[in-house]
């Protein structure tokens, strides 16, 4: 199959890596520089890269990568708390996690990585870890890796020729016309191919929509992403091999970029405006949106790259006729909403700030059903009943307990107590 990818960046080159295994790929990369701050990922990316045949040690070296084991939350609650990755996800582990929370025992120490996080160490194995990397280096490395396997065109698309929901061809700045069986839109918030007609905006859902970003010199190694609540949003710190990528994510309906820069004391921080939401139909006709053109929500738990690789895995199924386009779209639409709900949990209550932003976040009505089930009723079976795939009970409980939300009942089970004592050593 002949597939054209429009747009480079992380999404474009990850798409080229995945799709080039079974298809003829042309990537149209305008070579417009990326913002170049640090990017954070989740533990599922490492397993995905291995499936693509990537040498992880080489990859980490080439992208100035560093190991990530957790997210570490500061000023979201009375105390700092940790949401670590964990290798185990079987039902016994999840039952023990629930027992721990309902009996006021720490949940996070059940993770294989908890003690490493506390001591700022990394495991001997790469199993279950994630990576911090320098964003601009990923396309460079993958281009070098794929240059003899795919066609690379350094141009911009000036026109798109359509036939209903399908694209017949794209026309480049130099007048060249490119045809294909399928077109993949990796143009980010520009959405050059997919447009905005089918885009479900979440700007009315109390989501942060802007950021100011900057880099700082390397100070110390931290195997986790630091998230620090601020007056009108939160800051990230992502440690790569030789520097720290920083960003202040905020809601532009409360403050503007200059006010954000003033709050953090970085007058030259660059501004990014997010297009927050999801395409209702990520695949339509012979067009597929991958990456930011398909979906974006604030990068608090580093879900955006994971969403990209999930899209690519499901797209493989569509092309192999083991999944329909309708199933593809429905699963990704549901996933985007699940991610948004999980991130909303982080905003339930911040005792350290009483700004209008935090007050409105706490009172956001669209979260009511999940709040009722998880926080009021402690019905953690609700996660399983809804077939939520992105975050298991352990992750939800790390956030709920970290926010100092007390359990409403306890589980009396000596067997689970014994298992907890073994797992939390």
Language-model segment annotations:
Residues 1-9:
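Beta1/beta-strand and adjacent pyrophosphate-binding region of the FAD-binding site
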Residues 67, 320-425:
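Long, low-complexity C-terminal extensions of enzymes
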Residues 283-300:
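Short FAD-binding loop at a beta-strand-to-alpha-helix junction that anchors the flavin cofactor
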Residues 37-119:
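Dinucleotide-binding Rossmann-like beta1-alpha1 core, especially the glycine-rich loop
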Residues 12-13:
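N-terminal Rossmann-fold NAD(P) dinucleotide-binding loop
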Residues 229-276, 295-306, 318-321:
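Conserved FAD/dinucleotide-binding core of flavoprotein oxidoreductases
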Residues 127-260:
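Predominantly flavin-linked oxidoreductase catalytic cores and closely associated redox partners
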Residues 20-37:
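Glycine-rich FAD pyrophosphate-binding loop
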